[in-house]
UniProtKB/Swiss-Prot annotation:
Transmembrane segments: none annotated. This is Small ribosomal subunit protein bS6. PANTHER family: MITOCHONDRIAL 28S RIBOSOMAL PROTEIN S6, SMALL RIBOSOMAL SUBUNIT PROTEIN BS6M. The gene is rpsF. The lineage of its organism: Bacteria, Pseudomonadati, Chlamydiota, Chlamydiia, Chlamydiales. GO terms for molecular function: small ribosomal subunit rRNA binding; structural constituent of ribosome. Belongs to the bacterial ribosomal protein bS6 family. Keywords: Ribonucleoprotein, Ribosomal protein, RNA-binding, rRNA-binding. GO terms for cellular component: cytoplasm; ribonucleoprotein complex; ribosome. Binds together with bS18 to 16S ribosomal RNA. InterPro entries: Ribosomal_bS6 (IPR000529), Ribosomal_bS6_sf (IPR035980), Ribosomal_S6_plastid/chlpt (IPR020814), Transl_elong_EF1B/ribsomal_bS6 (IPR014717). HAMAP family: Ribosomal_bS6.
């Protein structure tokens, strides 16, 4: 049986602004540990800061955005999505295949 090769992914995650800094760090750690627990590797995490949402999600108008580049075997993505749906601190997430890790992102954050 042929072993599947890990692919590069770009994950966008939006966390609730009601979280304290410590709770937000733990929520992000829960996402990253989920990836590594399935044999994935975190390559880069971009903290994009607090931003206004395009529309209200669960009563929230703003969220903390993170962009994570990671590698994992493709079959793991469905398992990660199941975990993300159970994470109440995570307002939204999106996972896409990526061609390369972007080292620099340019976004403006809202003032705290």
């Amino acid at each position: 049986m042929k072993e599947k090769k890990a692919q590069l992914y770009e994950g966008a995650y939006v966390f609730s602004v009601t979280l304290s800094e410590e709770a937000r760090r733990k929520a992000l750690e829960k996402v990253t540990s989920g990836i590594t627990n399935y044999g994935g590797e975190i390559l880069k995490i971009h903290d994009q800061g607090r931003k206004k949402l395009a529309y209200t999600i669960r009563g929230a108008r703003e969220g903390y955005y993170y962009l994570i580049y990671f590698t994992v075997v493709p079959g793991v993505i469905a398992e990660l999505w199941k975990e993300y749906h159970l994470n109440e601190d995570l307002l939204r997430f999106l996972t896409l295949k990526a061609d390369a890790v972007k080292e620099v992102l340019e976004f403006a954050s809202l003032p705290e």
